[in-house]
Amino acid sequence: MLVTIQNARSVGGTITAPPSKSMAHRAVLCAALAEGRSHITNLEFSKDISATLGAAAQLCARVRTGADDAVVEGLGHFVPLAAPVDCCESGSTLRFLIPIASLTGQAVSFTGRGRLMERPQSVYDALYREQGLRFEQSAAGLTVEGALTPGEYRLAGNVSSQFISGLLFALPLLSGSSTLHLIPPVESRSYIDMTRAVQAAFGVQSHWLDENTLAIPGGQAYHPCDYTVEGDYSQAAFPAVLGAVCGDVTITGLAPETLQGDAAILDILRRCGAVFTRTAEGISFEKAPLHGVDIDLADCPDLGPVLMVLGLLCEGTTVIRNAERLRLKESDRIAAMEAELRAVGGLVESEGGTITVHGCANRLHAPAGALHGHNDHRVVMSLSVLALSTGIPLTVDDAEAITKSWPNFFEAIKPLGAEVEYA
């Protein structure tokens, strides 16, 4: 799908952050593993969350959805699988479920779409083979079989935290206790602690023995509860960058105290010179001169694409470090954003996991044709921010990719002054 984004008027208005996708994944799985009825409120049924709800229904729960909520009734046991578990394009769904699948006592196969089955699973592959379990991955799907055992687990701390969270979901349900030793540096620690916090709401505990070691008591059980998902800082980053550049944007629905690592967007914008205030009504941005800064993306990789847009619109140079994982997402986000930003005159270069963006707002121009969304929701939304921030109408293909995380994105930005045309 092609979409053209341009300014219908000057930028300004109020937008509500959508529910946190990261927290919703975790709440749905904890509810599914709990015997009994849980009610999860403030949900957005993106493709990723729908994939996790569908997987829960296949494995161990009854699921009933409303307009923005879901009742998840955990069965207290796993059911025989008649078909592979479809994870769609959701890396979180797949990586969270692989260890859970090892609790079922059966072979479990997973399928996916897009680049999902190309994304690396070497952490689990090595772990399963070490325990003598079956782990088979191909372009068509992935199959695991065999039961994990309680004990000592060693994982690199600089891999995706999704692997660590996946083990955190499953290990408390084993008969004995386990210890997770994370080889430093530990990146995305906030996502690990988010998993632990959501688990705690459902009655499951773990604790840090030191900054690199997690103790996970065995013999635990998840308990049903009512859970409200807070607003999503990773999605709020898009209107936040727009507000920092143009001013007069207010974002509502974000918790002041949060474990979301992507809340770092506010500190990054502040260091760039952004002016904003936080009140009971939300976070309100004023227009201010912005300058480039040095950004460490290790704990907030999802912010990468929109921060590359921000860098173009700042004075001076922005350097984004520890961004290697961007190359392994729905697209190679570094290469994708480099190509599209250069198409509008942007000055961007990268080497490995380091991205250098030169502020060049005054030399940006309309591209020769449509920009490419690379079937990546964050690329499409970042290019939309670029269009509104610069006043340059941009046509972007693969615009339907937004349904992966924020299906209502284009409608949500209209009150900020956006005009969106579909083709």
Question: Where do the language-model regions lie?
Answer:
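Short, structured segments at the rim of ligand-binding sites
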Residues: 1-423
